[in-house]
């Protein structure tokens, strides 16, 4: 999915879930696409409120992963995770994503995982470098909301 596709899929997901947009926060590859760090992603990783996640656990397929938070396969292109409301978020073109600093922390964590596929680890390292530069720019210095 390119940026335009991410935006469309995000708004469709928000509508389907019936949630406020700021309660559906993209992370991982989709957030990197929205920030311009990469051109495309395979899917959306969306963090949602615990109640929405629990509902999805009963309606969809729950996948438990060691060393990574649980996820629900909501659709072929969308995985849901539990939203951490204490983490910083920003809105880019109407799409809520974790802030560059939060995404940087996530990428650092993922890159240290022993079972991380090599190709993803290489991409993580590139994005870590780009995010380290991005967090230094005034464009993303807003407080968490």
Show where each model-derived region lies.
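Compositionally biased terminal segments of proteins
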Residues: 1-145
């Amino acid at each position: 999915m390119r940026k335009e596709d991410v935006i469309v899929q995000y708004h469709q997901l928000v509508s389907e879930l019936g949630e406020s947009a700021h309660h559906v926060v993209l992370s991982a590859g989709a957030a990197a696409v929205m920030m311009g760090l990469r051109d495309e992603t395979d899917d959306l990783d969306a963090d949602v409120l615990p109640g929405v996640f629990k509902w999805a656990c009963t309606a969809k397929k729950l996948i438990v992963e060691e060393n990574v938070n649980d996820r629900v396969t909501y659709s072929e292109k969308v995985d849901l995770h539990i939203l951490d409301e204490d983490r910083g978020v920003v809105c880019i073109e109407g799409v809520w994503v974790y802030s560059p600093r939060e995404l940087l922390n996530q990428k650092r964590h993922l890159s240290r995982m022993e079972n991380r596929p090599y190709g993803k680890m290489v991409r993580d390292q590139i994005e870590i470098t780009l995010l380290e530069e991005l967090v230094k720019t005034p464009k993303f210095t807003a407080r968490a909301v």
